[in-house]
Amino acid sequence: MSGLSGPPTRRGPFPLALLLLFLLGPSLVLAISFHLPINSRKCLREEIHKDLLVTGAYEISDQSGGAGGLRSHLKITDSAGHILYSKEDATKGKFAFTTEDYDMFEVCFESKGTGRIPDQLVILDMKHGVEAKNYEEIAKVEKLKPLEVELRRLEDLSESIVNDFAYMEKREEEMRDTNESTNTRVLYFSIFSMFCLIGLATWQVFYLRRFFKAKKLIE
């Protein structure tokens, strides 16, 4: 005997969006705080994909009360040393830039001053990709409904996942090509080494034969 059941419940895009956010969240957002001692430099590095918007907000608390001429410097560079953002006497602000290539980016905070000054507290909140987009502003400009905004966000998340998988597949192909090239080189080197050993053994046989003949130990 079967029980009664109601009409099937339609699931909207929100659970899937939450799942995608859970999967991508750790890689799209960098929120961290740390203490920066006087006359020290601390850097954070992160790999970011190509053509992605990167936004960030920072705040550096000054507990010195203006003593010791304490100054803080923020600089963001890529692996080639190109400066993407730089701020002298940084205390609080925001930054934004778009990546041109897949690269390792470095965010550095530097503190300079004199005397005995308490450590500065640095708070950094950096986002890239989907998380860096201001969907509230997009909704206002394009006059989107809340559901349409969530669908747009879901579409961007899906595209980001596809791009991540495509990049991983490309990296896998590159690593496979590298392994095949390495194996081929090892094979050629092994063959070359074998011929060298055979040649050396042959030379030793003829050399010893001539030596023993010279000593009249063999005919």
Curated annotation (Swiss-Prot):
Motif position, COPII vesicle coat-binding: 211-212
Region (Interaction with ARF1 and IL1B) residue spans: 207-219
Signal peptide positions on this chain: 1-31
Oligomer status and interactors: Predominantly dimeric and to a lesser extent monomeric in the ER. Monomer and dimer in ERGIC and cis-Golgi network. Forms homooligomer (via GOLD domain); the assembly is promoted by direct binding with leaderless cargos and may form a protein channel that facilitates cargo entry into the ERGIC. Forms heterooligomeric complexes with other members of the p24 family such as TMED2, TMED7 and TMED9.
Taxonomic classification: Eukaryota, Metazoa, Chordata, Craniata, Vertebrata
Record bears the keyword Cell inner membrane: no
Membrane-traversing stretches: 186-206
Membrane disposition: Single-pass type I membrane protein
Pfam family, one: EMP24_GP25L
Positions of post-translational Dimethylated arginine modification: 171, 176
Residue ranges, annotated region (Interaction with COPG1): 204-219
Region annotated Required for interaction with STX17, chain positions: 1-142
Family (UniProt): Belongs to the EMP24/GP25L family.
Gene from which this protein is expressed: TMED10
Record topology, Cytoplasmic segments: 207-219
Sorted UniProt keywords: Cell membrane, Cytoplasmic vesicle, Endoplasmic reticulum, ER-Golgi transport, Glycoprotein, Golgi apparatus, Membrane, Methylation, Protein transport, Signal, Transmembrane, Transmembrane helix, Transport
Main location: endoplasmic reticulum
Domain GOLD: 41-193
The organism's place on the tree of life at top rank: Eukaryota
GO biological process, one term: cytosol to ERGIC protein transport
Listed PROSITE patterns: GOLD (PS50866)
Organism: Pongo abelii
Span of the annotated motif COPI vesicle coat-binding: 211-219
Segments on the Lumenal face: 32-185
Keyword Cell membrane in annotation: yes
Role played: Cargo receptor involved in protein vesicular trafficking and quality control in the endoplasmic reticulum (ER) and Golgi. The p24 protein family is a group of transmembrane proteins that bind coat protein complex I/COPI and coat protein complex II/COPII involved in vesicular trafficking between the membranes. Acts at the lumenal side for incorporation of secretory cargo molecules into transport vesicles and involved in vesicle coat formation at the cytoplasmic side.
Protein name (Swiss-Prot/TrEMBL): Transmembrane emp24 domain-containing protein 10
Residues of this chain annotated as glycosylated in UniProt: 179
UniProt miscellaneous comment: Ectopic expression of TMED10 alone does not result in its proper cis-Golgi network localization. Interaction of TMED10 with TMED2 is both necessary and sufficient for transport of the couple to the cis-Golgi network, and TMED3 and/or TMED9 contribute to facilitating the process.
